[in-house]
Curated annotation (Swiss-Prot):
Gene source species: Brucella melitensis biotype 1 (strain ATCC 23456 / CCUG 17765 / NCTC 10094 / 16M)
Record protein name field: Xylose import ATP-binding protein XylG
PROSITE patterns for the chain: ABC_TRANSPORTER_1, ABC_TRANSPORTER_2, XYLG
One GO MF term attached to the UniProt entry: ATP binding
Catalyzed chemical reaction(s): D-xylose(out) + ATP + H2O = D-xylose(in) + ADP + phosphate + H(+)
EC number: 7.5.2.10
Family annotation (Pfam families): ABC_tran
Assembly and oligomerization: The complex is composed of two ATP-binding proteins (XylG), two transmembrane proteins (XylH) and a solute-binding protein (XylF).
């Protein structure tokens, strides 16, 4: 019997002659968690698609051994039957089906040729209880539950398939801190029961906490596999990016000028409960060249606030917005962009990209009028602009005409940034600009933010990562329960002070 539950040997994969994977090795023991680390586009997800059968045997080179025997899977059904289950970053849920129906999708219990819903609900409830998940009603549609709860339902679905190896791709990217803790504790329990795990995350503190071994890949090549006990987070970062990063936040001096943008008495109401305010009488000013961070707990109203300023909040709103001292009316994103206000949305996949369109066209769609003459697009001029943006933002793509959905999350995010920078905004709103982005891409995005500030662009940034808010902001607004709880200059500002303001403890305001 092999020492390893899984061995991937010398795995290679090409797309249109471009090597995505080149000689990758990965080994996992039963009861072991292997952290798989690498920058966006390094090949992590491609490797997991090979392992999980998304790319069937014969479409890649190398060998996979499972429980000591070579595995030649022709699809996902084969790998799941063997006990290899992947949980994708984008959850594979059918929102209007019940929790139980999602857990048993494709393997529904039947009686007399009909689905036995009583048996299915009972087995689903029993499964969740076994996983110590006691606050989910299996008869309710999945859309009733938060992203964190849906992640747990996906895990229950995997356990129902008798998973021996669980592949988790960025499982906490959209979870709250408490939901993340529940998930990590659950994975630790699985390890004690002998289940193996491959954990892919850009949150290296999570990797360090639950991984026994770390494998790093870069540009499709295997860089190192080492016990986590021998590594520090800076060690992993250095192996990922190929260079030492002494300062993740490359602060650069920039001048802060006069007030550029002002929001007065902004209030927004919940879409599903029109009597409930989600933003309650918030006012603030933003100066030319200033980076203003917005901090707060998940659900505090930060995204609702910035969405209303860009004209995309679907519920009722009221208040006044001023740009360069003049009141402006913003009812739609078109109004905002015409006034010089652009926004990078929180949900890149849903609101930021057109997935089947090329990378380049996703960048230039905001400024097509620049390349239009008598109703026709000057494709040569557009291509010059696309190539310039790809170089400026270091977007990794084999061809600007590839569908943007084929790019890694970090490179998609850079394309979204480009789309919102091309109109030359006076005010740039960034809602979770580095969510799902690796440490190297984060560094490049931070440098870009500072470069824009030096050019006089006013930046309003929402982030759930406190070190990020404190690392790049000139000033920090704190939102709690829809209200402005603090306005602090970022001078000796601590996470503790920001958190105290967010949860409503006394804090001194300083504009």
């Amino acid at each position: 019997m092999s020492e390893y539950l899984l061995e991937m040997r010398n795995i290679g994969k090409e797309f249109n002659g471009v090597k995505a994977l080149d000689g990758i090795y990965l080994k996992v023991r039963a009861g072991e968690c292997v952290g798989l680390c690498g920058e966006n586009g390094a090949g992590k997800y491609t490797l997991m698609k090979v392992l999980s059968g998304v790319y069937p045997h014969g479409t890649w080179t190398g060998e996979i051994f499972w429980e000591g025997k070579e595995l030649k899977a022709s699809g996902i059904r084969d790998t799941e039957a063997a006990g290899i289950v992947i949980i994708h970053q984008e959850l594979m849920m059918v929102p209007h089906l019940s929790v139980a129906e999602n857990i048993f999708l494709g393997c529904e219990p039947t009686t007399g040729g009909f689905i036995d819903y009583d048996q299915m609900n009972a087995r689903a409830a029993e499964l969740l209880a076994r996983l110590k998940i006691n606050d989910i009603n299996v008869a309710l549609p999945v859309y009733h539950y938060s992203g964190g709860k849906q992640q747990l339902i996906e895990i229950a679905k995997a356990i129902n398939k008798n998973a021996k190896l669980l592949i988790l791709d960025e499982p906490t990217s959209a979870l709250t801190a408490s939901e993340t803790r529940v998930l990590i504790d659950l994975i630790k329990d699985f390890k004690k029961q002998g289940m193996a795990c491959v954990y892919i995350s850009h949150k290296l503190d999570e990797v360090a906490e639950i991984s026994d071994t770390v494998t790093v890949i870069r540009d499709g090549a295997h860089i190192a596999t080492r016990p986590m006990s021998e590594l520090t987070t800076p060690d992993i970062i250095t192996m990922m990016v190929g260079r030492e990063m002494k300062n993740l936040f490359p602060r650069e001096p920039h001048d802060i000028g006069e007030v550029m943008f002002e929001a007065r008495n902004i209030s927004c109401w919940d879409v599903t409960n029109p009597d409930r305010k989600v933003v309650d009488d918030v006012s603030f000013a933003l100066r030319r060249g200033e980076i203003l961070g917005i901090a707060g707990l998940v659900g505090a109203g930060r995204t609702e606030l910035v969405s209303s300023l860009f004209g995309v909040w679907p519920g009722a709103c009221q208040g006044q917005v001023f740009l360069e001292g003049k009141e402006i009316k913003i009812r739609t994103p078109r109004d905002a962009v015409r006034q010089g206000i652009c926004m990078v949305p929180e949900d890149r996949k849903r609101d930021g990209i057109l997935p089947i369109m090329p990378v380049g066209h996703n960048m230039t769609i905001s400024v097509l009028d620049r390349f239009s003459l008598r109703g026709l697009i000057d494709k040569d001029a557009e291509l010059v602009a696309i190539q310039r943006e790809i170089l400026r933002l270091k977007v990794k793509t084999a061809d600007p005409m590839l569908a943007i959905a084929s790019l890694s999350g970090g490179n998609q995010q850079k394309a979204v940034l480009s789309k919102m920078m091309l109109p030359d905004p006076k005010v740039l709103i960034l809602d979770e600009p580095t969510r799902g982005v690796d440490v190297g891409a984060k560094y490049e995005i931070y440098k870009l933010i500072f470069a824009l500030a030096r050019q006089g662009v006013s930046i309003l940034m929402v982030s759930s990562e406190m070190p990020e808010v404190l690392g790049i902001s000139d000033r920090v607004l704190v939102i709690g329960e829809g209200k402005l709880r603090g306005d602090f200059p970022n001078e000796n500002l601590t996470q503790e002070k920001v958190l105290a303001a967010a949860i409503g403890k006394p804090a001194t305001n300083a504009a």
